[in-house]
């Protein structure tokens, strides 16, 4: 799975939190403290689209963008990728389970049946 750079993550956080699609100009306004050019945001959005993180709506002008998957789906994919890359999956799972709270452990038990 492709990783996110710092600006990519900032844009994705906005898209994940937004109930509606966003244009590059919307994102520029929401990230005004960074003083980014619209072209910079468009470049980042293009990269995110190429990586499969965003979907561009071509029927509106300016184009509007939405997250291709929820934040939770993205995080689950990352967890699965990490586990898949382990040479000793059991050791990784043991370490993970050893670090979860009692409430999270109960949730895991419930989900596993």
Describe each PLM feature range:
Residues 4-7, 59-78:
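Short, cationic-aromatic polyanion-contact patches
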Residues 9-14, 26:
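Pre-recognition alpha-helix immediately N-terminal to the DNA-recognition helix
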Residues 15-21, 69:
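Short helix-capping/hinge SLiMs at alpha-helix to coil transitions
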Residues 21-30:
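Short acidic, hydrophobic short linear motifs in intrinsically disordered regions
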Residues 49-59:
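A short, conserved structural fragment
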Residues 77-113:
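Amphipathic alpha-helical dimerization/coiled-coil segments
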